[in-house]
């Protein structure tokens, strides 16, 4: 190849693509990401005969430092889901009917079946989550975490003001 051919070949090569600017973080983008990830989890939960709300309530009971009363669990789940207390009580009743939670005096405690369900869902979702979150730089995850924490704090304050 001559110098002229080399120059011609180089000048006809496509320019390197310019990366598109990162989209702005918006309420819509946050919602779409939430529902996309939640859709994956709900698909797995459905295969185990469980709902998203049941999983949240069961996880609250399992991860509690001390035995929880139904009122304790309702308050904790309401803090996460912003759901109606009556609906959360219905979820706790469903978990008792499925024998995933059991009454122990005034407290509710998770059964072995409840723990096994959560462990099975976690095992099944782990590789899916790894594919969703894998390859995202740690600094991006840290920045996203800071933004999400701030949005959560502000939205919780707005909801508290609305319902005061």
Which residues does each PLM region occupy?
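Hydrophobic alpha-helical core bundles mediating ligand binding, dimerization, or RNAP-core interactions
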Residues: 26-30, 34-45, 118-121, 125-136, ...
């Amino acid at each position: 190849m001559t110098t002229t051919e080399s120059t011609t070949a180089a000048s006809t090569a496509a320019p390197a693509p310019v990366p598109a600017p990162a989209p702005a973080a918006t309420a819509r983008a946050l919602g779409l990401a939430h529902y996309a990830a939640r859709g994956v989890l709900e698909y797995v939960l459905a295969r185990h005969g469980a709902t998203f709300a049941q999983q949240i309530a069961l996880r609250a009971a399992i991860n509690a430092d001390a035995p929880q009363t139904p009122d304790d669990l309702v308050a904790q789940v309401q803090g996460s889901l912003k759901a109606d207390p009556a609906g959360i009580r219905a979820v706790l009743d469903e978990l008792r009917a499925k024998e995933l939670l059991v009454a122990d005096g005034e407290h509710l405690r998770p059964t072995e079946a409840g723990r096994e369900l959560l462990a099975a869902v976690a095992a099944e979702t782990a590789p899916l989550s790894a594919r969703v979150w894998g390859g995202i730089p740690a600094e991006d995850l840290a920045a996203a975490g800071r933004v999400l924490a701030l949005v959560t704090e502000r939205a919780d304050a707005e909801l508290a003001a609305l319902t005061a």
